[in-house]
């Protein structure tokens, strides 16, 4: 009998969009019926090829991301999910998420088709409740459509709805951000993500960065801290830097990334960490449709710095770093990092947990700097150990 491995997550990339947003650098292309049919066939073929490798796992999360998966249409999405369920050991309680734009999620009939097919979590790209701000960043929906999509989704049977918001938008005021949070909270989604705007090179918003007026760093910090307080006061616990959920509605799929669990990706640009190898497919729709599954990157466990990665990812979460787990798993002393964490604790940026350390909301704001400092302390410890081994003075502590 094969030994059952830890549960596996599946990520399925749908690269089609009605219109690319001004800030987006994800791999996405204009929607075309002929391409969508061919792509659906290619995905199903790829899923069938990989399915035998999942037999010793339980697949407990499936995530359709993009792009805008909802533009693929309910029937195509249903056929892809059917291939997943037929070929992979998907658990009865699996979390199956579909990303959607509000303008494409107002059709109750289509939503019912998706719900009956097995989708049970809907993630809506809301971004703002201010229609003027939505137009400024190239979004094609209105907040009225957000409200309509929530009503339709509830009627279709969705009991788990997530909404993405962005702060730091061009010209955005604190009042607009507060109003957005109030409007979204009133819709009672189970999960809310709040992301600071990132100006990615090559995007229209990046090219216009000198023409636009953006909230400065202090203003964005105030927006973030306001969101943390407002959401927690309304029953949304913060479980990761940008993510908040009602109890029991944390994104199980995204937790796999932060907990360094295995996931397999399908589609051009999709990433995987599966079978001891991390890899990604090239961003080439036509090549993928033609069956050319070319990797853009690939690393084995032997070359990955998992200890550094654990520090980086765990400090993104409310769980934080588990001291004993770190020392036993990576055979590294925690003390050099703990000395720094004590200093961060005194500054109000970190706090102790039952098993180790986590960052505070203010610590999350400067998490990149903190993580770099901790990883540098870890690197210095490794260097000292290597020097001790070379000199013959090393002993296990």
Stretch-by-stretch model annotation:
Residues 1-8, 18, 45, 347, ...:
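Flexible, acidic/Gly-rich N-terminal and inter-domain linker regions that tether
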Residues 5-9, 28-53, 57-332, 392-397:
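C-terminal scaffold of the Radical SAM
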Residues 12:
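Conserved N-terminal Rossmann-fold NAD(P)-binding element of oxidoreductases
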Residues 15-26:
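Local cysteine-cluster metal-coordination motifs and their immediate loop/turn environment
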Residues 331-343:
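Short amphipathic alpha-helical interaction segments
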Residues 345-355:
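A short, conserved structural fragment
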Residues 356-360:
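Minor-groove-contacting beta-hairpin "wing" of winged helix-turn-helix DNA-binding domains
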Residues 364-397:
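Short, amphipathic alpha-helical interaction segments positioned at domain boundaries
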């Amino acid at each position: 009998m094969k030994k059952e491995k830890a549960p596996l997550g599946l990520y399925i990339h749908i690269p089609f969009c009605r219109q690319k947003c001004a800030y987006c650098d994800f791999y996405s292309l204009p929607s075309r019926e002929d391409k969508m049919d061919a792509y659906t066939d290619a995905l199903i073929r790829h899923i069938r090829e990989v399915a035998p490798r999942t037999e010793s796992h339980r697949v407990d999360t499936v995530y359709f991301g993009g792009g805008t998966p909802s533009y693929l249409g309910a029937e195509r999405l249903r056929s892809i999910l059917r291939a997943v369920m037929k070929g992979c050991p998907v658990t009865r309680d699996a979390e199956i998420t579909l990303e959607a734009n509000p303008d494409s999620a107002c059709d109750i009939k289509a939503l019912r088709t998706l719900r009956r097919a097995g989708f049970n979590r809907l993630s809506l790209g809301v971004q703002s409740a201010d229609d003027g701000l939505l137009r400024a960043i190239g979004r094609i929906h209105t907040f009225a459509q957000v409200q309509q999509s929530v009503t339709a989704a509830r009627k279709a049977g969705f009991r788990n709805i997530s909404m993405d918001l962005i702060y730091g938008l061009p010209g955005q005021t604190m009042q607009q951000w507060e109003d957005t949070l109030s409007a979204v909270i009133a819709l009672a989604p189970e999960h809310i993500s709040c992301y600071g705007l990132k100006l990615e090179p090559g995007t229209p918003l990046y090219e216009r960065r000198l023409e636009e007026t953006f909230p400065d760093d202090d203003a964005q910090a105030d927006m973030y801290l306001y969101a943390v307080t407002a959401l927690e006061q309304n029953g949304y616990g913060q479980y990761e830097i940008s993510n908040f959920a009602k109890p029991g509605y944390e994104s199980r799929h995204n937790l796999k990334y932060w907990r360094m669990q295995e996931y397999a990706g399908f589609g051009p640009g999709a990433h995987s960490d599966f079978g001891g190898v991390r890899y990604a497919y090239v961003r080439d729709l036509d090549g993928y449709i033609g069956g050319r599954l070319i990797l853009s990157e690939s690393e084995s466990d032997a070359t990955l710095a998992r200890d550094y990665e654990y520090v980086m990812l765990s400090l993104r979460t409310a769980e934080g770093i588990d001291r004993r787990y770190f020392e036993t798993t990576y055979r590294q002393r925690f003390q050099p990092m703990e000395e720094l964490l004590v200093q961060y604790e005194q500054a109000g940026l970190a706090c102790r947990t039952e098993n180790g350390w986590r960052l505070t909301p203010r610590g999350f704001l400067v998490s990149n700097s903190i993580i770099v400092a901790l990883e540098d302390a870890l690197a210095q410890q490794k260097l000292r150990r290597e020097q001790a081994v070379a000199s013959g003075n090393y002993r296990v502590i």
